[in-house]
């Protein structure tokens, strides 16, 4: 059980902005076709044994009868929370006290899929989920698609993916350093593959796959990630004196 969602994260680390982001993350203000509402709607029944009142009111016209027997079946003792987190959106507390969406500056980084690069979302996703459900947590998916190509030297040089993963893993380490019970992180993904929504268009893998010949080429990020695992994260830029990324060559 691992929902996917965008994370509302605060524009600053002020208490007001953090509270506003948390309200939006677990709230129901977004359109019904937006995945941002799935956090509390899907996870509260499983972990807390009840549907959020706000969601019951919003979806009242579409819901079947929810019985006590339903909730007994849904609400089971689980060992951990699993969450897929790729990106998020910035929220601040407005002058009237209500949450406001903050536009990203033009030219800020995006992945090949067009998703924003927002490592803050991973930290605050972990933090907010831990505070709400009080269980150990796995990040069950995180990664990025890029426009990977084989270079003239026969290698795949995906520095953007290394930069992305360095920032997101730094966010995970911050959460761990602050005492949050992160017990695992799963990178999406090892091999370029058929993505359920985009087919072969998007390449998320650490290993490049030639879909015609099935040839595999380890990308630069694969060598870098090997060292991250070997060194238990000590080569992440957040652990370096000048915050530099230690790129690993094949």
Annotated model-derived regions:
Residues 1-250:
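Active-site region of glycoside hydrolase catalytic domains
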